[in-house]
Structure formats: C-alpha cells, structure tokens
Amino acid sequence: MTDILTNIFTILSRMSLAEGFGFNTDIFETNILNLAVVLGILLTSGREFFVSLLQNRQQNILQSINDADERYKEAAEKLQQAQNEFEQAKLEADQILAQSKKTASEIEVGLMNLIKEDTKKLLDMKQATISFEEEKAISEIRRQVIRLALQRALEQSKSRLNRRLQKRVTRLNIGLLGRLVTPNDV
C-alpha cells in the first residue's frame, strides 16, 4: 500500500506545471484539490483497511451488546430468584411469627392454669394447717382444762373430806359396783 502511495506522489511530482497538472504545495490555493486527491487515494487504497477496521469495531460493539444482554438476562434471573426467595422467607417468617404467638398464648394459658392450681393447693394446705393447728390448740386447751378441773376437784375433795366421809363414799361406790356386777359375770 505504501508503494502505491509513493508511486502516485512520484508521478504527480514529475509532471510539469506546463502540462496543466502538478503538485502545488501552497495549501491555501489548492486545498480542495489536494483534499480530493488525498481522499481518493485513501478511499481506493485504504478502503479494505477501513472496512475491516469498521467491521471489527462493529463486531466488538455487537459482542459487547450481546454480552451486556446476557448479563442483563442473568441479572434479571438472579433478581427474580432473589425476589422468590425473599417472598418465601417472608412467608416462613410470618408462619414462624404466627406459630410463636400461638405457642406463647398456649404457654401463657398453661402457666395461668398452673398458677391457679398451685394457688388452690397452697390455699388448701393453708386451710388444712390452720385446721390442724386449731384442733391441736383445742385439744391442748381441753387437756389443760381437764387437768385443772381434776386438780381443783382433788384439792376441794381433800379439804372437804375427812376420814369418815371418805369411808362412806368408798362403801357407796363399792355397793354401786356390786349391783352392776351380777354373780353370773364373775
């Protein structure tokens, strides 16, 4: 390709000015002509290069678009999967919350029943203890009253009875016992 360009410039430089065509180095005078020549040379000799360059660029752009589209599809699938997992986790969390509320309610009812039962048992035990202590106190008071009554009766009988009266009471009691016991009983 460089050989072609060199040949073209060589031919153009050998042409004389008298022939009407030549290479003018004054940019301001021949700018359009020079540009047309350069573009013509570039289009004819560099066309394949530019076409292949543009095709490579087009393929790279298409490949980038396809890659981006694939990544978008993968991201969309992952997003959908994550949303599904989130919804599933949300449902499970709601179920766990409902179950925990139900369990807490059942435990609360169970504990309240246990508290009621324990309270009833404690009240029953309290009442039984009070009744036992009352019976014990009443029994103790009875024993003391009986002991005091016997002691007092004994003291009174000692002070009132003399020997003669004692013999008489003893005979009377023996007589009463004798009537109660019949000869067949002995």
From Swiss-Prot:
It is a single-pass membrane protein. Its main location: plastid. One of its GO terms (molecular function) is proton-transporting ATP synthase activity, rotational mechanism. Disulfide bonds: none annotated. The chain crosses the membrane at residues 27-43. One of its GO terms (cellular component) is chloroplast thylakoid membrane. Pfam families: ATP-synt_B. It is found in: Plastid, Chloroplast thylakoid membrane. It comes from the Eukaryota. Keywords: ATP synthesis, ATP-binding, CF(0), Chloroplast, Hydrogen ion transport, Ion transport, Membrane, Nucleotide-binding, Plastid, Thylakoid, Transmembrane, Transmembrane helix, Transport. HAMAP family: ATP_synth_b_bprime (MF_01398). F-type ATPases have 2 components, F(1) - the catalytic core - and F(0) - the membrane proton channel. F(1) has five subunits: alpha(3), beta(3), gamma(1), delta(1), epsilon(1). F(0) has four main subunits: a(1), b(1), b'(1) and c(10-14). The alpha and beta chains form an alternating ring which encloses part of the gamma chain. F(1) is attached to F(0) by a central stalk formed by the gamma and epsilon chains, while a peripheral stalk is formed by the delta, b and b' chains. In plastids the F-type ATPase is also known as CF(1)CF(0). Belongs to the ATPase B chain family. F(1)F(0) ATP synthase produces ATP from ADP in the presence of a proton or sodium gradient. F-type ATPases consist of two structural domains, F(1) containing the extramembraneous catalytic core and F(0) containing the membrane proton channel, linked together by a central stalk and a peripheral stalk. During catalysis, ATP synthesis in the catalytic domain of F(1) is coupled via a rotary mechanism of the central stalk subunits to proton translocation. Component of the F(0) channel, it forms part of the peripheral stalk, linking F(1) to F(0). This is ATP synthase subunit b, chloroplastic. The lineage of its organism: Eukaryota, Viridiplantae, Streptophyta, Mesostigmatophyceae, Mesostigmatales.
